[in-house]
Amino acid sequence: MAASGEARRVLVYGGRGALGSRCVQAFRARNWWVASIDVVENEEASASVIVKMTDSFTEQADQVTAEVGKLLGDQKVDAILCVAGGWAGGNAKSKSLFKNCDLMWKQSIWTSTISSHLATKHLKEGGLLTLAGAKAALDGTPGMIGYGMAKGAVHQLCQSLAGKNSGMPSGAAAIAVLPVTLDTPMNRKSMPEADFSSWTPLEFLVETFHDWITGNKRPNSGSLIQVVTTDGKTELTPAYF
């Protein structure tokens, strides 16, 4: 149950990742009720749902759906932020192709699909669902086949959720954010020579999510929002087809 004064309620799928942890911290600091969904607990969250690792999508989806249902009961949430994901490279000839594709599908497609179903059950009317896309996946990604496939599927899912009879609550919005590179400790460690001024600060996305949750400058449902940082300045631009 949300304590008195906790203005809003949010689920963060991937709540122990770099961006997810920042979301949990920022929204708890605003006295919101925030639940983390991840493979490990986030002790800073109001509650945590621990995802059991499995090679069966249906097993994992059923487990998470059941545990979120127990946690929330009849309570609705203002937002579900799916910020789970990861990166793996490799072209179609790579020995690691199958393994990396499997990983990318689990980290991006499974989490996004489960989040979407949770939205149909637990999101308020007029609420917000965000999904984690990628600007690179607007085009071909020959050097990272699995990643591009997974993110492309997330983009398609987002647009489907905005359509009539998608199952989403009335007035709710599904929006995908399409960054280039996020400024995370892991990315800095793996790419120490990179131009960090072209990386998007996590705080920018956290504040963007806050705006959209509170109805400020929220894009239309189905929008694929490119997140591009140049010389330390970040801009949001819709992708059009």
From Swiss-Prot:
Keyword Oxidoreductase: yes
Active site: 147 (proton acceptor)
Pfam families the record matches: adh_short
Keyword Ribonucleoprotein: no
Residue numbers bearing the N6-succinyllysine modification: 70, 76, 93, 99
InterPro entries, per the entry: NAD(P)-bd_dom_sf, Sc_DH/Rdtase_CS, SDR_fam
Catalysed reactions, semicolon-separated: 5,6,7,8-tetrahydropteridine + NAD(+) = 6,7-dihydropteridine + NADH + H(+); 5,6,7,8-tetrahydropteridine + NADP(+) = 6,7-dihydropteridine + NADPH + H(+)
CDD domains xrefs: DHPR_SDR_c_like
An annotated Gene Ontology molecular function: NADH binding
EC id: 1.5.1.34
Residues modified to Phosphoserine: 170
GO cellular component terms given for this protein: cytoplasm
Record key words, sorted: NADP, Oxidoreductase, Phosphoprotein, Tetrahydrobiopterin biosynthesis
Primary enzyme class: oxidoreductase
Function, in words: Catalyzes the conversion of quinonoid dihydrobiopterin into tetrahydrobiopterin.
Quaternary context: Homodimer.
Protein name: Dihydropteridine reductase
Organism: Rattus norvegicus (Rat)
Gene of this entry: Qdpr
